[in-house]
Each structure stands twice: as structure tokens, then as C-alpha cells.
A protein has these predicted regions:
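Short, low-complexity N-terminal intrinsically disordered segments enriched in polar/charged residues
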Residues: 1-21, 119-160, 164, 255-257
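Structured N-terminal alpha/beta-domain signature
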Residues: 10-37, 99-106, 111-115
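A general structural-boundary detector
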Residues: 35-39, 90, 133, 145, ...
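A structural signal for well-ordered alpha-helical scaffolds and beta->alpha junctions
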Residues: 4-7, 46-49, 96, 143, ...
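A solvent-exposed, acidic/Ser-Thr-rich amphipathic alpha-helical stretch
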Residues: 21-77, 155-209
């Protein structure tokens, strides 16, 4: 249940002015509008969207929300925005919730919001997929090698795709941040201890030469079958061509400790 007010700005930058206007003011919408949120699910229609945005305004005020921009990736007619939403939790403590949104004006579902609900609820929540896998979707160069290594459960190949000081941040934020070869090796050895790799089914790939953002469906982790669930990962390349950072946005519960 997190709406980022900057999302319409990304829509504008893609040239979809009418959609951007509809997201800012659904009452004046001149085009169909739809989005998908981890809690609310699919939201379509001006009236439903207007009511949901009003609830969001109240929620942001109550939680004393501050939004930190992380990065934006443009490519293939899409944009992927990343933010950290700093907010007040139920216990009064401040927490940071990583949020990403895929903005895709040509899609029947032009705004797809990705984040874990664990930082808000203390638990994972299964979410139904928003897209179908696309067998044509491919991540390029080192990011493609990283994705293939994750699929195969090859820890050495995964870590080799990262720079020596590369970082991984999980969906729940900086508490799940790992830095450098040693920590990344330990992380992926743990991930692959459930019987093998994590074969992600790609749906979209958005690349700008520096970053690759890919939406996917996860329905297996090692030898454990999972309910099909959506997610998004953004990898940033460093000057050496290796992955400087990988940031994951999903709510998949790993079958490992």
C-alpha cells in the first residue's frame, strides 16, 4: 500500500501525458488508467483510483512518510523508478521500505508497483503475477550471466558477476544488505542450500547501458515449488563492467533460514 507521487513524472518523461494527468487527477482522466499495488491488487477506473489515492494521502501523513529517490532506468518505452520510503512503523520506529515501479504506457497495466510487505507487517504475503513470462526477454552481458547463474544455483558464477566491493540489497531494506565477495558468497550459498538455483521467468527487461531492470515470476526455489509470484531486480554496472549493486523488490519467502 505505497503510492509514490513521483510516478506520474516518469509517465510524463515517457511522453504519455494523458496517462500522467489521469494518475495525478483521476477525475479528469481522458484515457483508461490501471495500476497494480502489492496490497490493493489491481486498481482500474477513475473513481476507484481516486478513492485509493485519497487513502494513500492520509496514510503517508499518518506514517510521516519521506521519499528518497534511488535511481531511474529508461529503455524500450518503459521506465523503472526506485525509491526508499522512510516511514513510521506501528511501534513508532522509523524504517525504510524499498519500492520500485515499472511504468509501461503501452501495457494494459501501465503501472506495476513492487515491494515487500514484510517491513510493514512482519511477514511475507503471496502476490499473484501481474505479467506473463516472455521467452524473448533477455538481460545483456554481465547481468544476463548473473541471472543465468542464479537460475543454475552456481554461487561462484554469481559472485564472479559482481565487482569485488559489489553490494546486494534484499527486498526488506538495508538490514539485508551484503557487501563484498565474502558476504555475497555466504548469502548465495545460503540461498542455494534449498536444493539448487532460483529459476526466474523473465517478463520484461529495461536497460539503459548502466542499469538493467528485470521483472520476473518466481515459482520455484531450489527443489521447492512456490506459488507463482512477481518481482523486480535492478542491477547497476560499475566502471569495470561488473555488477556494482543489485537491488531486489519482491515478497518471496525463501525456503531457507
Amino acid at each position: 500500500m505505497v503510492w509514490i507521487p513521483q510516478i506520474p513524472d516518469l509517465v510524463d518523461r515517457l511522453g504519455a501525458t494523458e496517462l500522467a494527468d489521469a494518475l495525478r487527477d483521476p477525475a479528469s482522466a481522458t484515457v483508461p488508467v490501471a495500476l497494480d499495488d502489492p496490497e490493493a491488487g489491481r486498481i482500474s477506473g477513475a473513481g476507484v483510483l481516486a478513492a485509493w489515492l485519497a487513502v494513500q494521502d492520509t496514510w503517508r501523513a499518518e506514517r510521516k512518510v519521506e521519499i528518497e529517490e534511488v535511481a531511474t532506468t529508461f529503455g524500450d518505452g518503459r521506465a523503472v523508478g526506485e525509491w526508499v520510503v522512510h516511514l513510521e512503523g506501528p511501534d513508532g520506529e522509523r524504517t525504510g521500505l524499498p519500492v520500485a515501479a515499472a511504468v509501461d504506457p503501452a501495457s494494459p497495466l501501465p503501472v506495476r508497483i513492487h515491494h515487500s510487505r514484510r517491513p510493514l507487517l512482519g511477514r511475507h504475503v503471496v502476490r499473484r503475477p501481474m505479467l506473463r513470462p516472455d521467452p524473448r526477454a533477455r538481460a545483456s552481458d554481465v547481468v544476463g550471466a548473473y541471472k543465468a547463474a542464479v537460475d543454475a544455483g552456481d554461487t561462484a558464477a554469481v559472485v564472479a558477476a559482481f565487482a569485488p566491493d559489489g553490494t546486494f540489497r534484499g527486498p526488506s531494506g538495508d538490514a539485508y544488505r551484503r557487501v563484498g565477495t565474502k558476504e555475497l558468497t555466504e548469502l548465495y550459498e545460503s540461498y542455494f542450500s534449498a536444493g539448487g538455483g532460483i529459476p526466474l521467468k523473465l517478463c520484461t527487461v529495461t536497460e539503459d547501458g548502466t542499469r538493467s531492470a528485470f521483472e520476473y515470476i518466481c515459482d520455484r526455489w531450489g527443489d521447492t515449488e512456490l506459488p507463482p509470484q512477481p518481482g523486480l531486480t535492478v542491477c547497476t554496472r560499475g566502471g569495470d563492467g561488473l555488477i556494482a549493486s543489485a537491488r531486489v523488490y519482491d515478497d518471496v519467502e525463501a525456503p531457507v533460514e
